[in-house]
Amino acid sequence: DRDSCVDKSKCGKYGYYQECQDCCKNAGHNGGTCVYYKCKCNP
């Protein structure tokens, strides 16, 4: 599911989203970005 990483990945205030990226990649997505402190996976 596209937002499966939202609760599992930290999104810091200053663009720290490696954890989000890794989670999304592991879930089979093309990375991810942080939007309002929440991790959103790319399609």
UniProtKB/Swiss-Prot annotation:
Intrachain disulfide bonds: 5-23, 11-34, 20-39, 24-41
GO annotations of cellular component type: extracellular region
Expressed in which tissues: Expressed by the venom gland.
Main localization of the protein described in the UniProt heading: secreted
GO molecular-function terms, A-Z: potassium channel inhibitor activity; toxin activity
UniProt KW keywords: Disulfide bond, Ion channel impairing toxin, Knottin, Neurotoxin, Potassium channel impairing toxin, Secreted, Toxin, Voltage-gated potassium channel impairing toxin
Cellular localisation: Secreted
Pfam families assigned to the protein according to its UniProt record, in alphabetical order: Toxin_17
InterPro entries found in the cross-reference section: Ergtoxin (IPR012622), Scorpion_toxin-like_sf (IPR036574)
Domain notes: The presence of a 'disulfide through disulfide knot' structurally defines this protein as a knottin.
Protein family: Belongs to the ergtoxin family. Gamma-KTx 4 subfamily.
Role, per record: Reversibly blocks Kv11/ERG potassium channels.
Name this protein carries in UniProt: Potassium channel toxin gamma-KTx 4.2
Source organism of the structure: Centruroides noxius (Mexican scorpion)
